[in-house]
Amino acid sequence: RGLVGSEMCIRDSMKIVFATGNPHKLKEIQEIAGDGDIEFVLPAKGFNPVEDGETFEENSLIKAREAAKLSGNYSLADDSGLCVDALNGAPGIHSARYADTAQARIDKLLNALDDCENRSAKFVCAMTLVDGEGNLIYQTRGECRGEISRKQSGTNGFGYDPVFLVEKNRTMAEMSEDEKNLVSHRGKALRDVIKFIKSELM
C-alpha cells in the first residue's frame, strides 16, 4: 500500500481526520489550512482517547492513532498547552484539565501567579500525522512565547487566549483570527505539517 491510497488522493485533494472533539480547534485548523487542497473532518463516533502520555508529542500520537483506528484514514492530532516558567512548566500537558471550566482555568492560573514578576510563558503545540493503520508519518512542534497578563482581555479565541500577551500588550484574544494564526503555536505546527503533506503525500 502506498502512502496515499486512491481513495485519499482525488484531483490533488486529500481528506484527513483531525482528531479532536473541540469544534474551536477544527475551525482554527481549517482557517490556517486555507486553500482547500486538504479537507479536515472530525473523527468518527466513539472517539475518546485516553491521553495518558507524559509529553505533548506522546498525547498527540495517542489521539492520532485512535482516530485512525476508527476511520482507517490518515489522521492528524495536536496536543497543546500552556507552559508557565514560574510554575515550572505548569499547567503543561494538563492545561485542558487544570480546572473544570475555561473561566476556572484562567482564574486558577492568575491566582497561582498572583504578584509574581516573572510571567514568561509559552504555548506549545505538538502535531502528529499517522496513516490509516496508525503508523507514524510525521511529527512536529510549534511554540509561541509570550507573557501572562494580570487580567484577562479580549473576546476572540478560546482557552487561555484572554490572558496570553503576545505583542504590543495585546492578548491573543484581542487579535483577529488572521493575526493569531500567523503567530500561534498551532499555526506554526500546522503550516509545517501541510508543507510536508503537499511535498510528500500529494
Language-model-detected regions and their locations in the chain:
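Conserved CoA-thioester-binding segment of acyl-CoA-metabolizing enzymes
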Residues: R1, F18
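Anionic-ligand binding patches
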Residues: K15-V17, H24-M202
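Short, small-residue-biased leader/transition segments that mark boundaries at the very start
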Residues: G2-I10
